């Protein structure tokens, strides 16, 4: 498996998490939609599934880790930033095989791709605080 396959899986997972957060649809339905309606060329599908279902099923636990490092209520964080931070927090917490620097860098790249102009700074700062606490 190439690193780019995981990068593509993360990118697709952030989109699925974002969609799930906004729609409130069933996890299985959102996953099915993304697996059938998106191009999966070069995507580590198993990793996508793990990230998406992991974030969706462990959202309360992930938010408990994230909230102490926020300077505003989590409801005021943009849905894109929430999706990215939840995904990175999942990797940092449950995927010990992923070096923390890789998880943070990938999250920053996702924030640059999908977030507002300053999203990458917010994501980097929050994840740095989360890692420093561990």
From Swiss-Prot:
Family to which this protein belongs: Belongs to the NusB family.
Origin superkingdom: Bacteria
This protein's name: Transcription antitermination protein NusB
Entry-linked InterPro entries: NusB-like_sf, NusB_fam, NusB_RsmB_TIM44
Keyword Nucleotidyltransferase set for record: no
PANTHER family reported in the protein's UniProt record: ANTITERMINATION NUSB DOMAIN-CONTAINING PROTEIN (PTHR11078:SF3), N UTILIZATION SUBSTANCE PROTEIN B-RELATED (PTHR11078)
Keyword Repressor belongs to the record: no
GO terms (BP aspect): DNA-templated transcription termination; transcription antitermination
